[in-house]
Amino acid sequence: PKSRNNEITQFVKSGLNDLSISRTSFKWGIEVPNNSKHIVYVWLDALTNYISALNFPNTNDNLYKNFWPADVHIIGKDILRFHSVYWPAFLMAAKLPLPLKIYGHGWILSDDKKMSKSIGNILDPIEVINKYGIDQLRYYLVKEVSLGNDGNVSMDNLKNCINNDLANNFGNLCQRVFSFIERNCKGKLPLSSKSEQVDLILTDNLLNKVDELIDDMNKQDLNNYIKKVVEFSFNANKYFNDLEPWALKKTNVERMNTILYTIVTQIKNISI
């Protein structure tokens, strides 16, 4: 984000000094060739893993050709300098391509404070996943924490997010629609006949924003992206409630079928 870009720009403009890529103050690590008294600087060692994992120095390897340069490095703000200054310097010295983008994310806070064992405010992600599910946790973090900034999390907010967005909103919509089709259409999605304006408004509202959604994703604005998707789901619920397909079963089956086809199409689009 702009704030991180400004931070690194100012650091570079202030003047860069030579960086030693070896240390003599400890023994553990990778020895410098031809000088066992020196150990390779840990950040040179660690950052190189991005390409050594792709079988570098074999630049003809499919892994390397497919995944380097990286489209984006997503890294914590506390190690931004190592990725945005040192890592590009290492790559440029080796005449290797740079990652296309580096995105520095903020910290996840607990009760507005940095998580700390001494304070006792750590949320164990494994415990949370076992209790609520990994996709539910991912959804909550994406929706409630703006990627470029610090974000506060709490178990109460997590539960409210899961209940309000996933269970009561999208989950409830899917359950109602698919159970209705199971009971009244022998479990098969009926074909649509003639769509009315209200049907087109629902589906076009999402389709017309696809470019916006792609732009949000390219900018790593996942927070804004997911809020738009949640709005699509709320609108789909309203559509289903307002048009009451259950009231049309005996009076206008053709219209009922169109409503069902439209709402299932929208559920599919939201899921994608």
Model-found features: residue ranges?
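Short helix-capping and inter-helix turn/linker motifs at the boundaries of alpha-helical repeat units
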Residues: 116, 201-205
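Residue-identity detector for threonine
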Residues: 9, 24, 48, 59, ...
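Helix-rich, typically C-terminal accessory recognition domains appended to large enzymatic cores
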Residues: 144, 157-194, 205-272
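Conserved, non-catalytic sequence blocks in retroelement Pol enzymes and Pol-derived host proteins
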Residues: 197
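Structured secondary-structure scaffolds
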Residues: 1-183, 225-229
